[in-house]
């Protein structure tokens, strides 16, 4: 059976051991195995102007199986090629001239890509209650100090590349929306120096499809509720996001209830690959980070600021299929009263800081299916004095090579089981 460490004094810490330790535990039940497999294979991507989503509920405690099965049951659609299908307005580049039109009506002609896209968006039906779509055909530049603002019930499909130039301040982004609902970005390619690639605040029913951001500054995708923290941003679906070169995070959320993410791929970003702050009811298929947060305490996957806390408790509501980290800062980092999380598979190699750091977190299950940690910083269960200590942490199914596993101080109801140490040490309670 696994070794359980209840709230024991630090003096009862076991002696450090370097030998391989393997404990066999029963396999998951058939139902659990099927649910986990289904979740790992499901990536939800909604496309098309008529694809509407349903607001998340007020965060009732889900069961392990029901949440995964509900996500798996969501309609998965194959993403159409950029620009295909019907649309209501378009912005088209011909030579050096942009033209925005709706039907036979021309709403803009000139050399300004941002103005053309905004004119196309503004030509959509006023006061609409169903989605209308704008297609952008062509590549161009937008200033970092400006934005394309999307009102409610708007679909944007960018078939080309937006290069963000110069500097700016505040919450400027090539794609921006605030206080809206039913926003969709089907395709988006970005380069350059944005403050944010996509900035969404206090929104509901958001779909982000295929996003590719090859940046030299800024933050990739930021979705939050910081305009009115009394209201959750609700029901956000992200297909696949690739971000390289950002000086901050690839993807960050804050104050979101109801999040579904396919894959976040982060390459040489300055901080985290995926950072979830105060986000509940989230399902993530994969985080794949290489060189995320070099020289920092950020991580390929980070949870902070009471992430996963529903009311005053931590039911399992954050589900991650796989976290991959190569180099960078940390691999997995849970901090500041976060929890309610299960990470099925972990693959961490040569992280510059802790491979895993769990600090003042509650109900976190690491490597529920399998995991490897090779080289890099230690696996550490720690605590700061300003928050209650770790509670209900499970570390299991890990093969740890050329590293160490350490718990200090002793947490409450910590479980270590089925971990194999290869040329590694262990000091746990």
PLM regions with names:
Residues 2-60:
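Secretory targeting and sorting signals
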Residues 144-147, 165-172, 193-199, 217-223, ...:
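Short glycine/acidic-rich loop motifs that flank beta-strands on beta-rich extracellular proteins
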Residues 49-78:
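C-terminal region of N-terminal signal peptides and the immediate post-cleavage residues
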Residues 130-172, 190-194:
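N-terminal extracellular ligand-recognition/capping segment immediately after the signal peptide
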Residues 121-131:
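Beta-strand repeat architectures
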Residues 157-161, 181-192, 204-217, 232-245, ...:
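Right-handed parallel beta-helix
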Residues 224-231, 295, 301-314, 385-387:
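Intrinsically disordered, low-complexity Ser/Thr- and acidic-rich flexible linkers and loops
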Residues 70-119:
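Right-handed parallel beta-helix/beta-solenoid
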């Amino acid at each position: 059976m696994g070794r359980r460490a209840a709230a024991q004094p630090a003096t009862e810490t076991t002696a450090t051991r370097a030998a391989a330790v393997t404990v066999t535990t029963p396999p998951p039940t058939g139902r659990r195995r099927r649910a986990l497999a289904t979740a790992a294979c499901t990536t939800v991507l909604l496309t098309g102007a008529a694809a509407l989503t349903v607001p998340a509920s007020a965060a009732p405690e889900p069961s392990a199986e029901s949440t995964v099965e509900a996500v798996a049951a969501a309609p998965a659609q194959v993403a159409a090629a950029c620009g295909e299908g019907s649309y209501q307005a378009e912005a088209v580049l011909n030579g050096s001239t942009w033209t925005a039109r709706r039907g036979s009506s021309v709403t803009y002609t000139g050399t300004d890509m941002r103005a053309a896209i905004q004119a196309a968006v503004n030509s959509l039906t006023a006061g609409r209650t169903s989605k209308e779509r704008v297609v952008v055909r062509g590549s161009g530049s937008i200033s970092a100090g400006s934005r394309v603002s999307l009102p409610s019930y708007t679909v944007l499909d960018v078939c080309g590349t937006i290069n963000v130039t110069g500097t700016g301040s505040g919450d400027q982004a090539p794609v921006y929306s605030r206080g809206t609902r039913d926003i969709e970005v089907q395709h988006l390619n970005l380069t350059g120096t944005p403050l944010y690639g996509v900035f969404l605040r206090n929104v509901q029913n958001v779909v982000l499809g295929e996003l590719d951001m090859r940046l030299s500054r800024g933050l990739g995708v930021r979705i939050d509720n910081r305009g009115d923290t009394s209201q959750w941003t609700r029901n956000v679906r992200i297909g696949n996001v690739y971000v390289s070169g950002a000086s901050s995070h690839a993807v960050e959320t804050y104050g979101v209830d109801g999040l579904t993410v396919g894959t976040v791929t982060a390459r040489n970003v300055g901080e985290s690959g995926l950072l979830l702050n105060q986000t509940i009811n989230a399902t993530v298929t994969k985080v794949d980070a290489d060189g995320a947060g070099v020289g920092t305490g950020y991580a390929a996957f980070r949870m902070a600021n009471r992430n996963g806390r529903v009311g005053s408790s931590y039911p399992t509501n954050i589900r991650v299929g796989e976290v991959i980290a190569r180099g960078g800062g940390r691999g997995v980092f849970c901090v500041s009263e976060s929890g309610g999380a299960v990470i099925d598979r972990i693959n961490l190699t040569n992280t510059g800081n802790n491979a895993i750091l769990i600090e003042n977190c509650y109900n976190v299950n690491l490597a529920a299916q399998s995991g490897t940690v090779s080289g890099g910083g230690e696996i550490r269960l720690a605590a700061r004095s300003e928050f209650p200590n770790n509670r209900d942490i499970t570390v299991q199914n890990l093969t740890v090579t050329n590293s160490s596993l350490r718990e200090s101080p002793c947490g409450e109801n910590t479980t270590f089981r089925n971990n194999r140490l290869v040329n590694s040490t262990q000091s746990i309670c």
